[in-house]
Amino acid sequence: MIDPDGFRPNVGIILTNDAGQVLWARRINQDAWQFPQGGINPDETPEDALYRELNEEVGLERDDVEILACTRGWLRYRLPQRLVRTHSQPLCIGQKQKWFLLRLLSNEQRVRMDLTGKPEFDGWRWVSYWYPLGQVVTFKREVYRRALKELAPRLLTRD
């Protein structure tokens, strides 16, 4: 599902532990790391997509997490021209994302990246809250900065 402006609706997931660290996932067979994210299907709300993607990409269920916050609006990034599939219709030029800040309630050993036939990640680790800004692929950096900045106060006041 692509919107009229060419952006694919998507959810981004920032999963935190009790130490305030975030789950940082390695893309399968690559030296690229990112937060879990995924598209919103036509019949889904952003929250529905969040739980589906959380299970598909990280192996966690609804009961394993608590939603602490969500970004107020859509955050957009454009794909670099080399990644735009110019022969597909409708043309997708980027993603528009709702970002969710989650707290892990269960044991971290429940995190599994191999539950689907086509896993997106093959490793993960806990990193400091702001660490991803210096590590994520350049074209996603501004969206990460905006999401982390907007959601940070909720992490700091969660108790």
UniProtKB/Swiss-Prot annotation:
It is an enzyme of class 3 (hydrolase). Pfam families: NUDIX. A motif (Nudix box) lies at residues 38-59. One of its GO terms (biological process) is mRNA catabolic process. One of its GO terms (molecular function) is mRNA 5'-diphosphatase activity. Residues 6-149 form the Nudix hydrolase domain. Keywords: Hydrolase. InterPro entries: Nudix_hydrolase, NUDIX_hydrolase-like_dom_sf, NUDIX_hydrolase_CS, NUDIX_hydrolase_dom, RppH. It comes from the Bacteria. One of its GO terms (cellular component) is cytoplasm. SUPFAM superfamilies: Nudix. Its cofactor is a divalent metal cation. Its EC number is 3.6.1.-. Belongs to the Nudix hydrolase family. RppH subfamily. Accelerates the degradation of transcripts by removing pyrophosphate from the 5'-end of triphosphorylated RNA, leading to a more labile monophosphorylated state that can stimulate subsequent ribonuclease cleavage. This is RNA pyrophosphohydrolase. It comes from Pseudomonas putida (strain ATCC 700007 / DSM 6899 / JCM 31910 / BCRC 17059 / LMG 24140 / F1). The lineage of its organism: Bacteria, Pseudomonadati, Pseudomonadota, Gammaproteobacteria, Pseudomonadales. The gene is rppH.
